[in-house]
Amino acid sequence: VQSVGEIESLIQHFPSVNFVETHLVGDVFGRPKSVRLRSLLDLITDGPSMIINSDIEITTSTEVFTGYWGDLQHNSIKMGVRWDCSRRFNVPPALLKYGIDVFLLSPETARMLPDLGMTIGCPAWDYWIPWHLNRLSVTIHTSKRIEFMHEVHEVNWSKNEYDIGIRIMQDNYPNLTSPMLGSFIQELTGRTALKLRKIPV
C-alpha cells in the first residue's frame, strides 16, 4: 500500500510486488507520503492477514513460519517482537525492548480498529493496536521467537511525532498516561525485566 504518486517510482525496483494506491496518508503527522494504518486494515477482508514493517527480515523457513502464524483463533490476534542486530558492527541479535513490528489480524479484529490517524512508521501505532483491542476483550498472543530480524538504524521519527502519537492516545483514552501505556506493553510482551546491550547505529 502506497500513497498517490509513490507507486510509479517504486514499481521499477519491485516489479513483482502488487502495489495498492491509497489516499489515506499520515497527514496528522505531517507525512503525506506515509500511509495510515486504516489503509492496510481495509484490505483485511478474506481471512487473517499480517501487517509487518517493511524493514523486517523473516529468517525462519516457510514451514516453521506457517506452523505458528498460519493459524489464528477467533477473537484473538498475534503479535511479533523483532530482534535488532548490526552486521556492520558485528553485534549479535538482541530482543527489542520497546515496540512491536508484526501483527496478525482477522477481518473481525481489523474492523474493531477505528481510523484515528495512526500512521505506519510513526510513534504509537504499534502500541495502540493491542491497547484498543485489549479493551474489547480480544485475546492477544505475543511471539518473541528469533525470526523477525532488523538491522539497526537511526530513528526515523521526531520528538514532535512522538508527542502527536501520545496525544492521539490520550485524546481517545481519558486518563491514559505514557508510563501506563509503556507498562502495559512491557507486561503484555513479557519484557519487563529485559536488559539490552547498547547497539551502535
Question: Where would I find each of the regions flagged by the language model?
Answer:
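Short, solvent-exposed loop/turn segments at secondary-structure junctions
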Residues: 4-7, 25-26, 54-57, 83-86, ...
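C-terminal catalytic/acceptor-binding lobe
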Residues: 119-201
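A structural signal for short, well-ordered beta-strand segments and their strand-loop junctions
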Residues: 1-2, 49-51, 77-80, 139-145
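Short amphipathic alpha-helical segments and helix-helix/interface helices
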Residues: 8-11, 41, 62-70, 129-130, ...
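Domain-length accessory/inserted modules outside core catalytic folds
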Residues: 32, 46, 61, 87-90, ...
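Preference for well-ordered, secondary-structure-rich cores of eukaryotic proteins
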Residues: 1-6, 47-49, 56, 69, ...
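Active-site-proximal specificity loops/subdomain of glycosyltransferases
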Residues: 2-52
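Conserved catalytic core of nucleotide-sugar-dependent glycosyltransferases
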Residues: 56-134, 192, 196
